[in-house]
Curated annotation (Swiss-Prot):
Family designation: Belongs to the staphylococcal/streptococcal toxin family.
Protein name stated in the entry: Superantigen-like protein 11
Cellular location(s): Secreted
Entry function: Secreted protein that plays a role in the inhibition of host immune system. Targets myeloid cells such as monocytes or granulocytes through binding with sialyllactosamine-containing glycoproteins. Prevents initial rolling of neutrophils toward the site of infection by interacting with host SELPLG. Disrupts neutrophil motility by induction of cell adhesion via interacting with glycans but independently of SELPLG.
Domain notes for this protein: The C-terminal domain contains a V-shape binding site for sialyl Lewis X.
Length: 196
């Protein structure tokens, strides 16, 4: 097999989607301007609002928030800076998952052949941000399906809701910052399809 040279863009995507993430639950966040500050175990996290989340989170103190954090920038600074990913904490105690959905991954293996794998994908939040969904799904594809070992070309993830609405993540670029604050109802996800 020939070794493909990966573009810088693909290497950057691989680096970003392999970053550690933090899933902070049930915190209060303080909004000033377009930044919400969370303190968790003496660690400060500043989250920028870049999209529709600007209209949802009020100035001052906000209770019962979860935040999905991926550090932006590559500095070694002590502060965590992240974008979007804020959702309301689950209203109901769920023993395990909020729901399991079918994750279908199609991967071209030759000129006219495609391998398809189907797995259960667990959703743990009633309200889930596109940031978290996108990040964890790509992480799964990196770990299980060699995403970013080669150029992603026009690979996509498509999340379909029970009402027929859908959300698309293009795998050849990072999720746009203004979408990182978009939130959907995790209970209403019908299925997730990936074309690699």
């Amino acid at each position: 097999s020939t070794l493909e040279v990966r573009s810088q863009a693909t290497q950057d995507l691989s680096e970003y989607y392999n970053r550690p993430y933090f899933d902070l639950r049930n915190l209060s966040g303080y909004r000033e301007g377009n930044t919400v500050t969370f303190i968790n175990h003496y660690q400060q996290t500043d989250v920028k609002l870049e999209g529709k989340d600007k209209d949802k989170i009020k100035d001052g103190n906000n209770e019962n928030l979860d935040v999905f954090v991926v550090r932006e920038g590559s500095g070694r600074q002590a502060d965590n800076n992240s974008i979007g990913g804020i959702t309301k904490t689950n209203r109901t105690q769920h023993i395990d998952t909020v729901q399991n959905v079918n994750l279908l991954v199609s991967k071209s293996t030759g000129q006219h052949t495609t391998s398809v794998t189907s797995t259960n994908y667990s959703i743990y939040k009633e309200e889930i941000s596109l940031k978290e969904l996108d990040f964890k799904l790509r992480k799964h594809l990196i770990d299980k399906h060699d995403l970013y070992k080669t150029e992603p070309k026009d690979s996509k993830i498509r999340v379909t809701m029970k009402n027929g609405d859908f959300y698309t993540f293009e795998l050849n670029k990072k999720l746009q910052t203004h979408r990182m604050g978009d939130v959907i109802d995790g209970r209403n996800i019908e299925k997730i399809e990936v074309n690699l």
